[in-house]
Amino acid sequence: MATVASKQSQNSMLSNIWGWITTVDHKRIGILYGVTAFVMFLVAGIEAGIMRWQLSMPGLDVVSPDVYNQMFTMHGTTMVFFAIMPLNAAFFNYIIPLAIGARDVAFPRLNAFSYWTFLAAVLFMNFGFVVGAVPDGGWFAYAPLSEQPYSTNQGMEFWSIGLMLAAVSSAVAGLNFIVTIVNLRAPGMSLMRMPVFIWMSFVVQILLAFAIPVIAVGLIELTMDRLFGTVFFKPSAGGDPILWQHLFWIFGHPEVYILILPPMGIISDVLPAFSKKPLFGYPFIVFSGIAIGLMGWAVWSHHMFTVGLGPIAVSVFTITTMLIAVPTGVKIFNWIGTLWGGSIEYKTPMLFAVGFIAMFIIGGLSGVSHAVAPSDYQQQDTYYIIAHIHYVLFGGAILGIFSGIYFWFPKVTGKLLNEKLGKYHFWITFVGMNLTFFPMHYLGMNGMPRRIYTYATEYGWDNLNALSSFGYVILFIAMVIFIVNVITSLKSGEDAGHDPWNAPGLEWTIASPPPVYNFSDLPVVEGRDPYWIIKRRAIAEGKELPGPQALVDPSTVHLPDPSYWPAFTSLGLLIFATGFMIEIPVWFVKYPIAIVGGLLVFVGILAWSNEPITREKNH
């Protein structure tokens, strides 16, 4: 009997794993994105810890200069492309269909392909640690330092090809969500009735659609320089390294808004829920988000003031860098207006949202200072820049993401995160990040350059570096508290119910966690804050507050069937990418494994396109 039970348990586990591999359910894909991205967030944090350990005192030899360059490169790359972006994607996947009243995204299998290709990119780039070829050219990979002979191993191939895989994932996801938001909104949900999170997500998908091709061109050219001997960025052979900087930053500055706009949308949903009043200045927040998306294309060269662009170019980008602060300021004043006069409840999601506002103001002010070209010459490539980007991406994006995690965790799991541990997490994070990053402003103004692995006592940077490294320890403790909170809450947390925050969005009208079909009956939206409208009507009519939608038999709802072809196609892409790292000349073919991978991709696409979306039983 024990043997039979063991086999049944193994079969059940294998069936469950296969279910996750073949899933096309946006909610499961959102969870996959979130878990993978959080693991990579921790990996990036460990890489940062190694750097802070090395810099905690003058003259330390914790790691070699080569390893320090690898940690520096992988920390930035991982945090930007494999942590913050996919954490945002986790919210896109899970929340967008729920918040617009849809049963899934427009292209469920393409959604699955996006995740598996993202995972392929993560595995491919980090495989460099296994084979001793870790990228070491900086997360921005400035050519020609990222070219041969300055970076001699295969690390930068892992970097450039890995990011091309990530670019494929982001591009198809962006197009998928554009179609989803345009076509699958519930009846009555006009554009100006959409939640701000949906608006900011929509702007981000459009930014991705235009920004990804730019960096893809640069990555292809860099890879061709390294693998096939082209000279796009080699000045000794007529190439232009400044071309790489333009390509990278034309993508890179919209990328900043790709990272920060979703958390802005998150807190625009959190603040009204915990202020018990509608969002102040909804149209201004929406149009300021659109303005940020448009103006983000006009500021890239403030990263390049020391390149020698000339006074006219510097003057133009100085002006645009100042102007982009205006729509951001509009958002901040509207968020403050939402708080003003509200019945504020300082639950953990609200604390992280308010913390986001405070920290993003500091990051924004240090960013606007880059518009002063003469002082930017002094700030360029110093720790002042490190401080600025971390106040924007940690104080902004990460705090906003944690606000969203605490806000929607009950919807995803049906359990509330522990409020006491959550507040400990917030306050320790808040103190830790300021101890870590605020001293970097002074280090930069005192002349400490980025990317150095050690320094002499005579420079006077030791005390501030020690304080910054101590702040990292505080942040580490905060992350441990968060992980403990998640694990214990999943095991024995308080049941959340369907609407624990008395929130206004459509996602709170259904059970927690949501059924596989989301909505048994598609909702009809009568205005902004649709669930508040329903609840107020019930109160006015003397009725009980409405509960969640009634559950129905999933077999009666039209849903797409699982498919393994998206994962198969992504595996083909991974083999295709790996093939360029292994040179095995066969006849006239230099990279036969890449050809095998390409054939697998072709087979996957062909089979995918001929697979019916649903079987007859689900019609």
Predicted segments — roles?
Residues 2-619:
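Membrane-embedded and interfacial regions of multi-pass energy-transducing membrane proteins
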